[in-house]
Curated annotation (Swiss-Prot):
Protease as UniProt keyword: no
UniProt-recorded name of the protein: Nuclear receptor subfamily 2 group E member 1
GO terms assigned for molecular function: DNA-binding transcription activator activity, RNA polymerase II-specific; DNA-binding transcription repressor activity, RNA polymerase II-specific; enzyme binding; histone deacetylase binding; RNA polymerase II cis-regulatory region sequence-specific DNA binding; zinc ion binding
Main location: nucleus
Organism the protein comes from: Mus musculus (Mouse)
ZnF NR C4-type span: 16-36, 52-78
Chain residue ranges for the region called Required for transcriptional repression: 341-385
Domain NR LBD, residue spans: 155-383
Pfam families linked: Hormone_recep, zf-C4
Length: 385
């Protein structure tokens, strides 16, 4: 599949001026990798002031191996190689990179003319006709093309900016380990939510259902899709980091609530670890996403029990997704006869962390009290995605 215009994939074999890693093109006036350009952008936009860890300002090594060890020296190196601070500020105008601002703009109806199309490569092995399109929707990473620089045209799409990453082969499938600092966990969560919606919206079988059924399925499955995304993209789920992100501690949070949050974070860590032990490939993740999405079980909206308009079609789609996964595993992993069963047995664990905890930990700081289900509905209906 050919790469779309404007793809941010690395196409140049030119070293990053800051750390020496392979650059992905010119960023803020110099050739730089995604890691250093993203670090520079966040530092300038948020007006960060760093203190050298060794006390020797500018003396720490800044290379591919050590670039994350001292932010002060890394920023100094960015400035020394003439990265342009003004280019950051004028990119979209000064802003706080939060979902709250983007949601406000989004609800006012602004649309992105250029769009932000993800690069969706095809999978290595063929799949049945029903599922070929689904497996092709698995991206190489949470990587979207740049969006317009016009402030009034920002949408939720602009949250999905490239994050520093390193390729890692898992069963031949490129995965990405994030350089996620506390400040960027919420942005990574936003990208996961965005990509889950974009994925569902792009599944041909999903779009054949009524809009009401599509929204009900998405509202019920978003938590499982989110946790699957954490496992797939190797996003860190360190308890201390997540608590720091949420802002919760013993001084400002009821002990019973805090203990519940900590317990569910531990449950999240356990389920993510179990998925990573099995080293799933992109096709398996795509199949599991369909299995957890196509659930023809009546859902509750407050005290109201809602039923699907076409429950039979939804159940049939889930059956087909399971059959596809089973067939794929038998072909791809003939020496692992129990693999299919192991994957299915993992699915209930995706619901071991409550939606309220995910909202509290990953989204509360950025969207406040806006319900995720409302956000999902409006994002899904948007032509921007």
């Amino acid at each position: 599949m050919s790469k779309p215009a404007g793809s941010t994939s690395r196409i140049l074999d030119i070293p990053c001026k800051v750390c020496g890693d392979r650059s992905s093109g010119k960023h803020y006036g110099v050739y730089a990798c995604d890691g250093c350009s993203g670090f520079f952008k966040r530092s300038i936009r948020r007006n960060r002031t760093y203190v050298c860890k060794s006390g020797n300002q500018g003396g720490c090594p800044v290379d591919k191996t050590h670039r994350n060890q001292c932010r002060a020296c890394r920023l100094k190196k960015c400035l020394e190689v003439n990265m342009n601070k003004d280019a950051v500020q004028h990119e979209r105008g000064p802003r706080t990179s939060t979902i709250r601002k983007q949601v406000a703009l989004y609800f006012r109806g602004h649309k992105e003319d250029n769009g932000a199309a993800a690069h969706f490569p095809s999978t290595a092995l063929p799949a049945p006709a029903f599922f070929t399109a689904v497996t092709q929707l698995e991206p190489h990473g949470l990587e979207l093309a740049a969006v317009s620089a016009t402030p009034e045209r920002q949408t939720l799409v602009s949250l999905a900016q490239p994050t520093p990453k390193y390729p890692h082969e898992v069963n031949g499938t490129p995965m990405y380990l994030y350089e996620v600092a506390t400040e960027s966990v919420c942005e990574s969560a936003a990208r996961l939510l965005f990509m889950s919606i974009k994925w569902a919206k792009s599944v041909p079988a999903f779009s054949t259902l009524s809009l009401q059924d599509q929204l009900m399925l998405l509202e019920d499955a978003w938590r499982e899709l989110f946790v699957l995304g954490i496992a797939q993209w190797a996003i860190p789920v360190d308890a201390n980091t997540l608590l720091a992100v949420s802002g919760m501690n013993t001084d400002n949070t009821d002990s019973q609530k805090l203990n519940k949050i900590i317990s569910e974070i531990q449950a999240l860590q356990e389920v993510v670890a179990r998925f990573r032990q099995l080293r799933l490939d992109a096709t398996e993740f795509a199949c599991l996403k369909c299995i957890v999405t196509f659930k023809a079980v009546p859902t509750h909206s407050g005290s109201e029990l809602r039923s699907f308009r076409n429950a039979a079609a939804i159940a049939a789609l889930q059956d087909e997704a399971q059959l596809t996964l089973n067939s794929y595993i038998h072909t791809r992993y003939p020496t692992q006869p129990c693999r299919f069963g192991k994957l299915l047995l993992l699915l209930p664990a995706l619901r071991s962390i409550s939606p309220s905890t995910i909202e509290e930990v990953f989204f509360k700081k950025t969207i406040g009290n806006v319900p995720i289900t409302r956000l999902l509905s409006d994002m899904y209906k948007s032509s921007d995605i």
